[in-house]
């Protein structure tokens, strides 16, 4: 079993130069504005307001870093249980899409994000959040293609389909035809959260 023991806010950075020291593997959460990144991070770590969300989609332009301590139960050959612990850094990125900011500011914002995603050496996992109710949007496909364009051998991408409590089984099947292997999760109903933490832990640490 994999569980979160503790989580705390580290820093908000406008660009990679002000990011915290690279002390652990980083998990970058990204997706469209209003896809539910902050809500999902709070649900994953079982805290109500660790990650702050904006009432105006696209307004948040800072890269927010959080330290998350995980514990994993391991059984040895003799059947004895032990526990390993590891820290990951969750990174809540600004939403892609319709930010109501000046064009010059928007261009700088995109440049900062691009530099962080491409050149931050300790990013090991990209968690691409996709609204399961609006799964066939071009911007989500563009984000996926963008990540694939510079993905290193030591990095992975997970597609998490948010707000999945709104879908019935046939609708979920339709979504999986577009994103095979994606994981459904609901911050509201807390469904798929345990599996999501397991996927994050194992993939970020290359296990």
Describe the residue ranges of each PLM region.
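Switch II of P-loop NTPase G domains
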Residues: 60-65, 76-88, 94-123, 133-146
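Structured catalytic cores of enzymes that bind and process phosphorylated ligands/cofactors
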Residues: 27, 32-35, 41, 48, ...
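Conserved nucleotide-binding/hydrolysis micro-motifs of P-loop NTPases
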Residues: 57-59, 71, 95-97, 133-136, ...
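Active-site-proximal flexible loops/turns
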Residues: 49, 99-102, 138, 169-172, ...
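Short, glycine/charged-enriched secondary-structure capping and boundary segments
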Residues: 23-24, 44, 103-106, 141-145, ...
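Canonical P-loop GTPase G-domain recognition
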Residues: 4-18, 163-207
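Conserved C-terminal guanine-recognition region of P-loop GTPase G domains, centered on the G4
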Residues: 110-181
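Conserved G1/Walker A P-loop phosphate-binding module
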Residues: 1-98
């Amino acid at each position: 079993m994999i569980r979160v023991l503790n989580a705390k806010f580290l820093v908000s950075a406008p660009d990679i130069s002000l990011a915290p020291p690279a002390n652990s593997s980083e998990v970058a959460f990204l997706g469209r504005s209003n896809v539910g990144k902050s809500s999902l991070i709070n649900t994953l770590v079982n805290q109500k307001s660790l990650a702050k969300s904006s009432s105006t989609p696209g307004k948040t332009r800072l890269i927010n870093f959080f330290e998350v301590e995980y514990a994993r139960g391991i059984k040895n050959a003799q059947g004895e249980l032990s526990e390993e612990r590891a820290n990951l850094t969750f990174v809540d990125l600004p939403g892609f899409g319709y930010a109501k900011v000046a064009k010059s500011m928007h261009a700088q914002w995109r440049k900062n994000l691009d530099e962080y995603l491409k050149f931050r050496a300790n990013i090991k996992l990209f968690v691409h959040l996709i609204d399961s109710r609006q799964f066939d949007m071009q911007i989500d496909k563009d984000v996926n293609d963008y990540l694939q364009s510079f993905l290193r051998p030591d990095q992975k991408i997970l597609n998490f389909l948010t707000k999945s409590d709104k879908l019935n089984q046939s609708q979920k099947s339709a979504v999986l035809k577009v994103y095979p292997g994606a994981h459904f999760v609901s911050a509201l109903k807390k469904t798929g959260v345990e599996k999501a933490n397991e996927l994050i832990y194992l993939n970020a640490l290359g296990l």
